[in-house]
Design a protein with these regions (language model features):
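Rhodanese-like catalytic fold shared by cysteine-dependent sulfurtransferases
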Residues: 2-57, 64-95, 104-141
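Short, surface-exposed ligand- or partner-binding patches at beta-edge/loop junctions that are enriched
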Residues: 99-100
Length: 141
């Protein structure tokens, strides 16, 4: 008797590979129109490679006081609470790297920017906390 509820092994392999590729495609450089979270190490590489590109902007979405206490060198501060009011001042064709303390606020900003038509928005996974944990540079002031 044939078990009609069991998937053939080949179908399982194809399904697994498809899901794996879909997940891996959510990183920069894979042509994904909806980029998402990137590691602090990848963010540091991106900053190094794009530092001279005027269309590349690092945005710290924490409060002014949090920003002053320590931020990624070259970042600008736009508090997540006011970003919706300031989004028209940003170029939707630019490349943005956003972060907050741990990822909560930047996730909301990431969604807001994507919904507003920004196509190149990257979010640092774990925020500046993860950045600092990896020993990456922080500016004060």
């Amino acid at each position: 008797m044939v078990d009609n509820h069991r998937l053939p092994p080949l179908v399982l392999v194809v399904l697994s590979l498809t899901l794996t590729c879909a997940c891996l495609g959510n990183t920069p450089g894979h042509g994904d129109p909806n980029p998402g979270l990137i590691s602090p190490a990848l963010a540091a590489t991106m900053i190094e490679e794009m530092r001279d590109d005027p269309g590349f902007v690092i945005i710290d979405v924490r409060t002014v006081d949090e920003f002053a206490a320590g931020h990624i060198p070259g970042a600008i501060n736009i508090d997540s609470a006011t970003l919706a009011e300031q989004i028209d001042n940003l170029d939707p064709n630019g490349t943005y790297l956003i972060y907050c303390r741990r990822g909560g606020r930047s996730a909301g900003v990431h969604s807001l920017m994507r919904e507003a038509g920004f196509s190149e928005v990257y979010e640092i996974e774990g925020g500046i906390s993860a950045w600092q944990a990896e020993g990456l540079p922080v500016a004060v002031g």
